[in-house]
């Protein structure tokens, strides 16, 4: 906020409190350094920072990387909830199929040097070896409950 706005310190502090609590952190987490936070708390603090300027679009790069399955599922739910309540567009790079299923309405994949964007249901209809292996292979079965 300091770098991109001319808001008063008091107003910046209030915005920080709102964003920190919005992502499920206690207010006092806003006063801590990253090294003083757990991995999951750091992810949430980063998300609060990304939301500080009220963007319409949020870009996330492997948002659940390094989180345990419970923490990853909770973070997925948080992203989906914020996406819906704030009307956010979330552009996400991930290899986590559980996150894809939990968060994404549309998915983009690179196939034969072409980008294909569609819903998961439509992507699964594509008769392409990579699509079938990636979304129906052994690692995908757990995510899809197959």
Q: What is the role of each PLM region?
A:
Residues 33-37, 41:
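Conserved ABC ATPase signature
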Residues 73-86:
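Helical segment within the ABC ATPase nucleotide-binding domain
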Residues 100-102:
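A short, surface-exposed alpha-helical micro-motif characterized by mixed small hydrophobic
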Residues 54:
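Conserved catalytic motifs of ABC-family nucleotide-binding domains
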Residues 58-61:
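Catalytic Walker B motif of ABC-type/P-loop ATPase nucleotide-binding domains
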